[in-house]
Structures are given as structure tokens and as C-alpha cells.
């Protein structure tokens, strides 16, 4: 429920000696949406048209990544069951990460991952980085508009355990 590196950089092991050289490490930005297309490609199947991810099998085989993604996006929407976690949008490149919070938090974050891989220094207010921050923020919002991410997905939900807060007079 956050866009920090320990939640994003999840290790993955792949074993297929017929296709993948032993000891191969992929440094490119791969996402969970890429796993199914990769398995399908390894099985000789075409990716389904509605799938958003891409096969990273060429990367596993040691191929070049000239046309591989240069950034990843993140979106997490507030949930009733986790009220302390805000809606979060983010974009990450090889070097920078911009995180946009919505709600009462509203303290956005910007990190230089080359200089600060543990994300301990928020650079959001640094004057010399404002052009980069604006560029990533615009890119993030362009992506959200293209993918429908600006429409907050609300589920029909009734939580009887807590009742109707208007009528319960407690929160």
C-alpha cells in the first residue's frame, strides 16, 4: 500500500534452463503485469490483447532492452478496510521517483534513487529539481488520464459490522 522501494522491488526467481541462462539478473523495470505474458511467451503462446503487460522473456534470455519501458507507474486507491492509507499515485524512472498523495496527507515525495536508494531524503521542495518534478507529475497525470485512473473506483459496499456511521453516532 505504498510506493517505496521495498514494496516495488520484489525479488523473483525464474527457472527454465531451456530458455534462461543460469545466473541471469534482469535490471530493467519489470512489473507484476509482465509475469503472465512472460509465461505465455515461454509456452509459445501469444499475449491476449486485453493484457497490459509485456513479456520480459527476451530480457531473461540476455537480450537488449532498447524498447523496454523507461518508467513504471503506481496507483493505490483508499480502501474502507485501510482508512489510514491514502490514495497514492506515483511514477518511477531509473533515477527518480515522484509520489503523489491525496487526502489529508498531501505531502508529496520526490527521491533521487541514485543518490538516496533508501528514500530517506524527500527532495520535493528543492528548487533546482522543480522542472524534473513537474515533468514527472505531468507524465503521471497524462498516464492516469489515458488509463482512466482519474476516476476513483468506488465499490458498492455495506459494512454491517460498523453500521451506518450517520446513524451510529460514532466513528
How would you describe each model-predicted region?
Residues 83-85:
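Residues that act as N-cap/strand-start positions at coil-to-secondary-structure junctions
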Residues 70-74, 158:
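WW-domain-binding short linear motifs
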Residues 99-103:
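Short beta-strand micro-motifs enriched in acidic
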Residues 116:
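Intrinsically disordered, low-complexity polar regions and short flexible loop motifs
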Residues 1-50, 54-66, 94:
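Substrate-binding rim/cap in mid-to-C-terminal beta-strand-loop elements of soluble/periplasmic
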Residues 7, 88, 95-96, 108:
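Structural motif
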